[in-house]
Curated annotation (Swiss-Prot):
This is Nuclear protein localization protein 4. Belongs to the NPL4 family. InterPro entries: MPN, Npl4, NPL4_C, Npl4_Ub-like_dom, NPL4_Zn-bd_put. Involved in the import of nuclear-targeted proteins into the nucleus and the export of poly(A) RNA out of the nucleus. Has a role in the endoplasmic reticulum-associated degradation (ERAD) pathway. It is a peripheral membrane protein. One of its GO terms (cellular component) is nucleus. PANTHER family: NUCLEAR PROTEIN LOCALIZATION 4, NUCLEAR PROTEIN LOCALIZATION PROTEIN 4 HOMOLOG. Pfam families: NPL4, UN_NPL4, zf-NPL4. One of its GO terms (biological process) is ubiquitin-dependent protein catabolic process. Residues 219-359 form the MPN domain. Keywords: Cytoplasm, Endoplasmic reticulum, Membrane, mRNA transport, Nucleus, Protein transport, Translocation, Transport.
Length: 563
C-alpha cells in the first residue's frame, strides 16, 4: 500500500505494508525529506477523515493497520513550535541539554572591569571606561589573545540582534545548522535533482572562513599519567595508537562563558597498530564502544572525544621526535578532519537555541605529536559547523596533500554548490578564491587550548591510572586476566588495608574488567562504582559496604585460587 505525507517539505509517497510499525514508515519518510526534528515534535493526522492529530512518537509502536490507515491516505505532518509568545529570556528548555549548558544559558557572562585612570566618579559610580563588557567583546578577545569566543558568548551576541529583550515578541531561535544537501522534494513545479533544479532547492554558494566561536574552549586532562600511559604504547612498540576520551564537561572560567572537557580516562578500542597509522574493524569497535559508553554512564562519564598519536623518533637518542605538524605543513590532515566531522555528526550537541533542537558538537580531537622543540606535545581541535555540513552532504574527501581537502564531483545523488574561500595574495590583499578542485583544510579547523588542573578544586574521579593493564594491549604483552587482578587487589585485601584497596579500585580499566566478569550483581556493581568514584575518606568508608556482599566474597575466593 501507499501512504501520502504532506508537510512543509511538499508531498511524498511512501510504500509500506499494513503489518509494518508506523515508526518504520515514518523513518522512511524522514530519510526522504532529510527532516531532523524528533518524533516528539511531529504531529500526524489524516485530514480527509477528520482524525485527530497525534504526536508521532505515540503512534510509532503501532502498525499501520492498527491505526486504521488505508491505501492512498493523505497524512498531514506538522511540527510543534519551539517557543511561544515569550520574552527573549524564555527560550524553550531542552531536557537533553547538558547541565553546563543550562547553567551558562542562565548567566549574562559580563566581563567585569576595574576603575581606570579615566574614570571621574566615586567607588559606587560607573562610566563607559569601567562598565562591564559583553562576553563577545572583540577588544577583550584581542587583548587576551583569544582566537575564538565561547559558544554561549556567540549565542548571546546573536540573541542581541535576533531577539530584542524589550519587544516581548515570539522567540526566534538564533541558530540554524548549515545544510548543504539539495532538496529533492522541492515544492516548485519542476522535476527533482538531477533532472531539474531551482533557487529554492539548491543550497547557496558556500564562503569558507575561520569560525569565530568554538563549542569547547579547553581540554583538561585530570592527570599527566593519563597521557603518559597512552604514549607508552608508542614508546614500547614504535606503533601509533588511538583512543577515546571519557569524562565530563564543566565551565571554564578563563574564557567568558567558556566550557572545558575534563578527561578522566582514555579507552583504546581493538586496533592493529602500524608505524604510520592504524586499522580497525569498525563494526566490532562500534559494538565495543557502545558497551563502554553504557558502563561509563554508570560512573557519571561520557565520551568526550578521541586522541591519537603521530610520532616518529628523531634518532638522536635523547627522546626527541620529529615535528611534522606546523603552520607550513598541516595541523590536521584532510582525512583526520573528515573523521573528526563524522564523529561530531554522531555526537550532536542538544541546544535550545537552534531551530533543529541541536547544534554542532562538543566532541574534541586531540593529537599527540612533536612540537617545534622536538618534544612530545598534545594539540586539541574541533572542526567547524561548515566541515560537519560538507561531510554530511558528501561534498569533500581526503587528498594526497594532507593540508588540502578535495571537492567531489557532482552526481545524481550529490549536488556540489559553488565554494569559495578568502586568502591574502602575495601583495597582502584579501581576495576570494574558488575552492575547486581543492582548498586548505585550515578553514575547517577550530583550535582549543589544553592542559592539566591548576588547583584541585574538583578531585579526579579515578585515583589509579596505571597498575592494572589497559584493555586491548595484547600486542604489547599486556593482558587483562585473573592473574593481573590478583596482583593488583589481593595484597591490600589480605592485609586489610582498605585505604589502599580503595585507591586501587579507583581505576577506570579495572572497573571495565570487573564488569565484564559478571560476578557482581547490579546492586553490588553500583556499590563498587560508588567506592571507585568517591574520594577518600568517604570512599574508604564505602568499601565496608562493598566487601560484605556475596559477589565480592566470590571474587576474593577466585583471586585466592588463581595461580
Amino acid at each position: 500500500m501507499i501512504l501520502r505525507f504532506r508537510s512543509k517539505h511538499g508531498m511524498q509517497r511512501v510504500n509500506c505494508e499494513g503489518s509494518e510499525q508506523f515508526g518504520t514508515v515514518l523513518d522512511r519518510w524522514v530519510k526522504l525529506v532529510h527532516e531532523r526534528a524528533p518524533r516528539e515534535a511531529m504531529e500526524v493526522g489524516v485530514a480527509e477523515r477528520q482524525i485527530e492529530t497525534r504526536i508521532a512518537a505515540e503512534m510509532a509502536q503501532k502498525t499501520v493497520e492498527q491505526l486504521g490507515l488505508k491505501h492512498g491516505d493523505m497524512l498531514s505532518v506538522s511540527f510543534k513550535e519551539t517557543g511561544g509568545s515569550l520574552a527573549v529570556a524564555a527560550a524553550p528548555e531542552r531536557s537533553s541539554e547538558l547541565a553546563v549548558d543550562r547553567e551558562l544559558a542562565r548567566e549574562e557572562g559580563l566581563i567585569r572591569r576595574s576603575h581606570s585612570r579615566l574614570c571621574r566618579h566615586g567607588d559606587r559610580g560607573m562610566c563607559e571606561y569601567c562598565s562591564p563588557l559583553p562576553p563577545w567583546d572583540r577588544g577583550y578577545q584581542q587583548e587576551q589573545n583569544l582566537k575564538h569566543i565561547s559558544f554561549h558568548a556567540h549565542v548571546k551576541e546573536l540573541n542581541e540582534h535576533t531577539n530584542k529583550k524589550a519587544s516581548g515578541s515570539t522567540y526566534i531561535p538564533p541558530l540554524s545548522p548549515p545544510d548543504f544537501h539539495v532538496n529533492k522534494h522541492c515544492p516548485a513545479p519542476h522535476e527533482p535533482w538531477p533532472r531539474g533544479i531551482c533557487s529554492k532547492c539548491q543550497p547557496s554558494a558556500i564562503s569558507l572562513q575561520q569560525q569565530e566561536f568554538r563549542m569547547v574552549d579547553h581540554v583538561e586532562f585530570q592527570h599527566s599519567e593519563l597521557v603518559n600511559e597512552f604514549i607508552n604504547t608508542w614508546r614500547s612498540t614504535g606503533m601509533q595508537r588511538f583512543g577515546y576520551l571519557y569524562g565530563r564537561y564543566a565551565r571554564y572560567d578563563n574564557t567568558p562563558l567558556g566550557i572545558k572537557a575534563v578527561v578522566e580516562a582514555i579507552w583504546e578500542p581493538e586496533q592493529h597498530d602500524e608505524q604510520d597509522g592504524l586499522t580497525m574493524d569498525t563494526v566490532a569497535v562500534r559494538v565495543s564502544v557502545a558497551a563502554v559508553d553504557a558502563i561509563a554512564a554508570d560512573m557519571g562519564l561520557m565520551r568526550l572525544g578521541m586522541i591519537f598519536t603521530d610520532l616518529t623518533d628523531s634518532g638522536s637518542g635523547d627522546g626527541s621526535v620529529f615535528c611534522k605538524r606546523h603552520k607550513d605543513s598541516f595541523f590536521l590532515s584532510s582525512l583526520e578532519v573528515i573523521t573528526a566531522a563524522r564523529h561530531q555528526l554522531h555526537h550532536r550537541n542538544a541546544c535550545r537555541f537552534s531551530d533543529q533542537g541541536f547544534y554542532s558538537s562538543k566532541f574534541v580531537t586531540c593529537v599527540v605529536s612533536g612540537n617545534l622543540q622536538g618534544e612530545i606535545d598534545v594539540a586539541a581541535y574541533q572542526v567547524s559547523t561548515d566541515a560537519e555540513a560538507l561531510v554530511d552532504a558528501d561534498i569533500i574527501s581526503g587528498s594526497t596533500h594532507p593540508s588540502m581537502a578535495y571537492i567531489n564531483e557532482p552526481s545524481a545523488e550529490r549536488y556540489v554548490p559553488e565554494i569559495f574561500y578568502m586568502r591574502r595574495n602575495e601583495y597582502g590583499i584579501t581576495i576570494k578564491e574558488n575552492a575547486k578542485p581543492a582548498f586548505p583544510v585550515d578553514y575547517l579547523i577550530v583550535s582549543l587550548t589544553h592542559g592539566f588542573p591548576v588547583a584541585a578544586d574538583t578531585p579526579p574521579t579515578f585515583q589509579a591510572h596505571t597498575g592494572f593493564p589497559w584493555a586491548n594491549r595484547q600486542a604489547m604483552g599486556q593482558s587483562q586476566d585473573y592473574l593481573e587482578l590478583r596482583r593488583v587487589l589481593l595484597p591490600s585485601i589480605a592485609a586489610g588495608d582498605y585505604t589502599e584497596l580503595h585507591r586501587r579500585l579507583s581505576s577506570f580499566h579495572l572497573l571495565l574488567y570487573l564488569h565484564s566478569l559478571q560476578i557482581l550483581d547490579a546492586s553490588e556493581w553500583r556499590r563498587l562504582v560508588t567506592v571507585a568514584t568517591t574520594p577518600a575518606p568517604r570512599g574508604v568508608e564505602a568499601v565496608y559496604d562493598l566487601i560484605s556482599g556475596p559477589g565480592w566474597q566470590t571474587l576474593v575466593m577466585i583471586l585466592q585460587e588463581a595461580a
